[in-house]
Amino acid sequence: MSGSHTDAGHVVVIGAGIAGLAAAHRLLDRHARVTVLEASDRVGGKLLPGEIAGVRVDFGAESILARRPEAIALAREVGLADRLQPPATATASLWTRGVLRPMPKGHVMGVPGTAAALSGVLSDEGLARIERDADLPRTEVGDDVAVGEYVAARLGREVVDRLVEPLLGGVYAGDAYRISMRSAVPQLFEVARTHTSLTEAVRGIQERAAAAQQTGPVFMGIEGGVGGLPHAVAEAVRARGAEILTRTPVTELRREPSGGWRIVTEGSGNLGIAGSAGSAGSTGNAEGNAGTGVLHADAVVVAVPAPAAARLLRAEAPEAAAELSAVEYASMALVTLAYRRADITLPDGSGFLVPPVDGRTIKASTFASQKWGWIADQNPDLLILRTSVGRYGETAILDHDDAHLVDVSRHDLREATGLTATPLETRVTRWDDGLPQYPVGHHARVARVREHLGKLPGLAVCGAAYDGVGIPACVASAAAAVDEIHGDPRTVQHLTAHPVRSLHGGAGE
């Protein structure tokens, strides 16, 4: 029995990103009375729907890893089954050494089963270095190792710099030579512990994937945008009696002497909104004035980014707070551009990734109108593109204004694709400290956080800072938090043993 066990009662969820909303959804399945508190003026966190040139798009995450069940199942449960759509094309390119090159097949997160799989992407020297893998002695990985460090030791730096780095960077906006292999690419970590040759291990992964005959798309989108998922979850939990209060930042979280939790909010004009059957105000467990409010709960799920979680936990769980304060984040920006289709011709495919070693400004570009049929169908006369700029350790570009980010994006798009037309409209979306970094030892840090919190009944954490940055990982993290406060540690134990992949690592799809 977990030390954080509590019976179903009133549970406050702090944070209305997809993890917090998924936690609320699961709590209602356990017959809890739920209040969700969100500091900003909207739900959804990093999932942000929007519009450019009259076309609905995503200004945050745009796809869901469909080979994991958690997020797709949640979408179906909240009525989005008929809006799930696979990409119209999954063919991508690499912009490297001055040319757009087809993304190689036959690799796992950029790690090839044979040198031939990367022909055309690597130099002759780089391809020859891969062949040495079979003759090298075993590379020990210990309790964890950086993805880049291990792959470079086995196959050479060129594999890391030209392929592993842009693939990992597309998800974490991080540095492959710092990112934990155990947490970020667990399938490679597992085989690295049991195999000497990395290429042989990758071929084994590919053979098992082929034998399993996995069918269906690797990724899935949602008509109208993935940003519609949190709104659908919010509507579903409200319909079941939960209350969601925006513009309600939590300033203090304290354990009650008699058990339960005291949650102090400020700026909470929404506190105790009339007409919500399960609202804190209508059930007598809220108090306060025009500027502050106090809620009392049997349990709390903290579903906010690590720095905010650290501030809330400092009074009651200082050790956990110290661990969370050390979590680093990457900042980046997305530049979305709308063009007249008649003005431009794009290469085939869904877009391209850019290895940092090539020294370009943009890190990737998505041809959104070619990737997603639902975007193209809204206005066949337009083409929507987006680029990403900035990553961990490379923030100087983000000091520039939006106009400059548009200019450098257009420059790199011209160099890569020949695109010279002037866009009809542009939008820049900045995600400051948007992506948590998973350095070597991340799994141990998360375990320590949960160990500290396990001593406090009715308290758990979830979100992108723990079990993976993808949407399925956030949903799985939420499920683990809910089960934990109800005395069931098995979901957390499963997540610890089997980390959720935040990106596809199959047979080179």
Description of each model-found segment:
Residues S2-H5, P104-G106, V111-P112, A290, ...:
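Conserved flavin/dinucleotide-binding core of flavoenzymes
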Residues S2, T246-S282, A286-L385, Y392-L398, ...:
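Mid-domain catalytic core of redox enzymes
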